[in-house]
Amino acid sequence: MSQAITGQPVNLTASGAIYGKPAQLIGFYVNSTTAGTIILKDGGSSGTALSGTITPAVGWHFFPADFASSAYATIGGTLNVTFIFQP
């Protein structure tokens, strides 16, 4: 028997908070993009980068990551992305 991995969604089209408290990212779904990029950070816009610059294709991206204080995404280009996380 398999167990589903579930989480809470948050959609972003510009840089912003994924979640303002400690959280675990499961991954993200890119709804649409035109040269879009993502940098994931722990601790807000000036926080510690947990990734390099990601240039994702449309679709699901499994990206497990722990955010000790808060989860933030810096978005460049044109990108519509839904992050799935667990508080």
Where are these regions (language model features)?
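Tight coil/turn sites that cap or link beta-strands
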Residues: T13-S15, A57-G59, A68-S70, T78
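Noncatalytic modules at the cell exterior or secretory-pathway interfaces
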Residues: I26-F28, P64-T78
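Glycine-rich strand-loop-strand elements at beta-sheet edges
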Residues: G47-A68
